[in-house]
Every structure is written in C-alpha cells, then in structure tokens.
Amino acid sequence: MVTSADDVSATLAQIRKHNISFTVRGGGHSTSGAASIEDGIVIDLSKMRKVTVDTQAKTVTAEGGTIWEDVDVEAAKYGLATVGGTVNHTGVGGLTLGGGYGYLTGKYGLTIDNLLSVQIVLASGEQVIASSTSNEDLFWAVCGAGQNFGVVTAFTFQAYDQKNQVFAGPLVFLPDKIPQIVEFANKFHKVNDGNQAMLMAFSAPPPANVPVVLCQLFYNGPEDEATAFFSDLYELGPIANMAAMIPYEKLNSLLNQGAGFDGRKQFGGGAFKLPLDPSLVVQIHAEFNAFVASHERMNGSMMLFEIIPYKKVIEVPNAKTSFANRGDYYNVATMFKWFNPAIDSEIRTFSRSLLKKTSETVASRSTDRGVGQYGNYATADVEANEIFGANVKRLEELKHKYDPDNLFRHGNRLIPRPLVVVN
C-alpha cells in the first residue's frame, strides 16, 4: 500500500522498468472490476484517506484513497458539503474521474463540475497539479476520463453551505403501484427546482424476497415542504415509510446495503427519458422480476432509475470537459448479484437486453448532445466512442501526450494516437 505521491511515483518507476501489469485501487468500489487484477499488482491508495477543509475558501481536499463517507463527515463538521455519490463507501477517485452524480447534482452539477484541481502522478512518474489554470488540457481529460491519464493522489472540490438537515429515505410499494409512481416521476421531471431527487428501484430483497418498488426520496429542505412535494406518492399508501429528516452526512449511507460487497456482480448502465410510458415500465419490471425469480440467490439484485435533475449538468457544454454524457435524460442501471459462476454469461446478456429496451426511450442521442452512456456504469464491452462521443479524438491525442506507452490501460478503452496536422 502506498502512503504518498512519492510512493506512487516510485511504484510506477518499477512498473515501467519491469513491464509489470497493474491497476489502481481507490475506494475499491469499481463496478467494472477495474480495482483488481490477476497476474499483476495493485497500487492501493486506501492508506491515503486524509480530508482537509478550508473554511475560508469553502473547499475540501481529499486524498486519493478516500471514500465519500470521509468527505461527507469531515465537511459536515464545518456545515459544508460537496457533490458526492449516492453510496458513501464509493471511492472519491473512481466516482469523480468518471463524472459523478449525486443528490446535490440538481443544484450544483456533476462532481467534476465542482472539481477545482487534482494532484496527479503521470505515467512518467512526474507529479503535477492540473486545474483550469495549470495543465489545462490534462485537467480537461481528467474530468471524465481521468483513469486513463495517471494516479490522482489528491482532489480539491468546491464546497457549499449545508447546515440544515435534509429529508430523505425510502417509501416502499408493491408493484401494482408502478403506473402511478411513473406518473409522479413524469410530473417530478417538470416541477423540481434542483433541490429534490428520486431514485426508483425494482428489487425483491431478502429475507422476504417479495418484489417491491423502492422510491428513495431526497428533499433539501424542511419536512413539511418535502411531504407536500411528494404527496402524490404518500397518497398511494406505501407499505413502508422510512423517510425522515436526517443530517446530510448520513444521506449517502441510505443505499449502502443495496451495494454490498458479497457475491458476484454485474453492473450495467444506460439512459431513459421522461415522460415514460407507465406500461413500458410495468413490462420492464415484469421481465426483471421474472429473471430474478427464476435463479437461485439473486434476490439482492436491483434495477435503478436515477431521477436526478439534469438542468445544471447540461448548462455545461459537452466539449467543456471530456465527460460526454450531458443530455436531457436520466441514468438507469442494473445491478445483478448472484453466486453461481455458471450463469455469468446469461446474466450479462439479459442485463444488456433490459438496458437496451429502457434506453430506447432516448431516441435523440448524439455525440455532441450527450451519448446516453455514463462511463462509471459502463461494462467492459462498451467502446470509448460510446462513452466519450465527439471528445474521443482529443482524448486519444492527449493520451499520446501524457501516456504514449498506454501504461494506464487496465479497464480503460482509450488508445494513444498522435496529433495529425494537415497542411
């Protein structure tokens, strides 16, 4: 395990010298398995978890091995918060370098939109600072494709006042309420002001293993306003209601159980557009539930519709950062968990099929208006152009500049390509 940027530089020197395969582990939460490797070494940053808060500048600096719980808890001591994920044992590095959506995205944009600078160790072993005013082209690449360019040993984020508690937690419904829940989602799409979010999940969680629909609510404000905003859902009669006022630093722990570490995993992503046809969602749920029910020990699986407002996200042009998933749509993910390796291929095939059907609601995807594929949710078979769209050419040119030998290639898709100048 490394404990400093100097350790990372020294490790990379040995990797280059002896041509050793390697990967980098931040929080160890990689949905693609990129935080582990066979027949190679892991540059493990988990001993680098220091978080520093500058109360005057309202910034938070987190070392490369931090998880979001570290950031949330430390920032909260000063009444501050920044845009993190929705599960607090996710690594700061992985989520940030791939873009980063969270409950505060509706108000402040993506995690990378609030990233001020990084300290990064390049393939050469050189340690540099990248920001909007220093190594600007590298910073552009880091904001969406950072895993391809080096090991980030420190991140500095803009933080915001978050002294009030937030209203959050799940309402649980039986599947017969799906049409009405979808109608509310369609309404939410029109009336939210960025201070709200809703995650709709299909699952049949143990020990009951009964199919349910979970609606994870978020409202950055008082309880009376929150219950009024979500009143359509309350009127449906949830079978369980665990939503309440909680400290912000507890918010990102609410989904931790659904993102546990046991079993085999398949995580895939796509996009969907609102308004949704309720009958389509009913059909998708039926297919998901039938598949899960027909396999042993798969009840920890989930399909998640992330209704996180995108207005602030699309205020930033797709060419402004390497992240190319800025569009008028929302992310959807499948998270399958099982224990029998004999069905690995079957699960991957089914996941792709289900996501394809859902993503067909986004008919207007294009390389310059948002690709409809969140890189942090992408499986290994998704190509670079599908994630980075029109930005892929510049990324590959920068890859040639900063990592011409493709040292950072584990789990990544970019190929170093020299800039071609046409006279």
Regions found by a protein language model. Give the residues of each.
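Soluble FAD-dependent oxygen oxidases
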Residues: 1-423
